[in-house]
């Protein structure tokens, strides 16, 4: 055991001693609240010592103790901050403990009306879950909650960023209707801003691919509708690719479909999300040529 861990354990013992003294009759008469403040300081210092030793579990425990004492003393904001500190330690070793701490922090901030803070913490939880494919549904849930709070605070840009994550993962989980709805909403929102207008092209492209995953005819109608909403979309490589893919699927030409994707990818690299969706469309066409 290193020096820092030894000091941290001493500080924890000191904190517990102060709390025991505070509970006694004389403690309550003579500066009981000061003893609690001293105990909080000991736990926070111990937490930092454990952090220096990279003992993340013990560090998290110390910040949780400090948070509980802050909450008991009525210092809700400080309690929220300590739960966040605890979460940052736990997330290096135990995602669920990290999430539990952030949820406690969120409860405090929503009760205080600090919805932007609550939204950011929901976003952090979503980010923790998104690294595990088995937790994508949980990630979606927290991104949606974050977006909801951001919208309530008029942070439209932050809300849209979260909703785009929801759409991305919804499509991965084959909930294409949900993904389409979000991409279309965010595209429409982007068209209202001269700065964001150009990004609508990507969202329409993603929505069209989701349509193509469900129904060829729907995809054909959708891209015509998108071209009316945003005429510049018609001149884009994305629009032309969707058009060619639709034609190849209509003709049951899988080789043509593959070539069109390769040509596009040679100039504009397709990331894993696009590749996954396109492979699913190709596989479905292989298995059931009559997509119409």
UniProtKB/Swiss-Prot annotation:
Its job: Required for vesicular transport between the endoplasmic reticulum and the Golgi apparatus. Also between the endosome and phagosome.
InterPro entries assigned to the protein according to its UniProt record, in alphabetical order: NSF_attach, TPR-like_helical_dom_sf
A Pfam family reported for this protein in Swiss-Prot or TrEMBL: SNAP
Membrane topology label: Peripheral membrane protein
SUPFAM superfamilies assigned: TPR-like
GO biological process terms held by the UniProt record: chemical synaptic transmission; compound eye morphogenesis; imaginal disc-derived wing expansion; intra-Golgi vesicle-mediated transport; intracellular protein transport; mitotic cytokinesis; neuromuscular synaptic transmission; neurotransmitter secretion
Protein name, as recorded: Alpha-soluble NSF attachment protein
Subcellular location, record wording: Cytoplasmic vesicle; Membrane
Keyword annotations of the record: Cytoplasmic vesicle, ER-Golgi transport, Membrane, Protein transport, Transport
GO molecular function: ATPase activator activity; SNARE binding; soluble NSF attachment protein activity; syntaxin binding
Gene name tied to this protein: alphaSnap
Domain of life: Eukaryota
One GO CC term, this protein: SNARE complex
Main location as per UniProt: cytoplasm
Family: Belongs to the SNAP family.
């Amino acid at each position: 055991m290193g020096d820092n861990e030894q000091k941290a354990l001493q500080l924890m013992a000191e904190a517990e001693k102060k709390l025991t003294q505070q509970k006694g009759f004389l403690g309550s008469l003579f500066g009981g609240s000061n003893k609690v403040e001293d105990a909080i300081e000991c736990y926070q210092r111990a937490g930092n010592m454990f952090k220096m030793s990279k003992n993340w579990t013990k560090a998290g425990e110390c910040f949780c103790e400090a948070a509980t004492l802050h909450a008991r003393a009525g210092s809700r904001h400080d309690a929220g901050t300590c739960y966040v500190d605890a979460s940052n330690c736990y997330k290096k070793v135990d995602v669920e403990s990290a999430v539990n701490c952030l949820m406690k922090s969120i409860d405090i901030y929503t009760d205080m009306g600090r919805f932007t803070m609550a939204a950011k913490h929901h976003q952090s939880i979503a980010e923790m879950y998104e690294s595990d494919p088995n937790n994508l549904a949980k990630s979606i849930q927290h991104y949606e909650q974050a977006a909801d709070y951001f919208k309530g605070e008029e942070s439209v840009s932050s809300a849209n960023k979260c909703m785009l994550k929801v759409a991305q993962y919804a499509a991965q989980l084959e909930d294409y209707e949900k993904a389409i709805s979000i991409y279309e909403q965010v595209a429409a929102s982007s068209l209202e801003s001269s700065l964001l207008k150009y990004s609508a092209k990507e969202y329409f492209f993603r929505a069209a691919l989701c349509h193509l995953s469900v129904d060829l005819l729907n995809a054909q109608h959708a891209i015509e509708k998108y071209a009316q909403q945003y005429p510049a979309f018609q001149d884009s490589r994305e629009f032309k690719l969707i058009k060619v893919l639709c034609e190849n699927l209509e003709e049951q030409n899988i080789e043509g479909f593959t070539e069109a994707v390769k040509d596009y990818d040679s100039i504009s690299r397709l990331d894993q999300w696009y590749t996954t969706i396109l492979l699913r469309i190709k596989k479905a066409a292989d298995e059931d040529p009559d997509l119409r």
